[in-house]
Amino acid sequence: MSAAPVYQLNDLLYLMARLRHPDGGCPWDLQQDFASIVPHTLEEAYEVADAIEREDFAHLPSELGDLLFQVVYYSQLGQEQQLFDFSTVVHSITAK
């Protein structure tokens, strides 16, 4: 039996790039834009808050991951439109 893979941030960035790739990406993901994923972002943020309020710390990492996925999604959209990328987001928060 082999150990489960340990994923890193670059794996998530790669996954999003694959989902949004014009050739062979996910049809649903390819249709999305900044505005269309806002409801999903809000839902994920509420799920993080709910897990914290319920002190469900076993489930919190999964909910935080879902919220991080939203940030990665926006970053991919920004990169595609040559507005910004994930590194810009990280630099922005770190420089604050």
PLM ranges: what are they?
Residues 1-60:
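Extended low-complexity intrinsically disordered regions
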Residues 41-49, 57-79, 87-94:
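An amphipathic alpha-helical micro-motif enriched in hydrophobic residues
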Residues 83:
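Compact nucleic-acid interaction/catalytic patches
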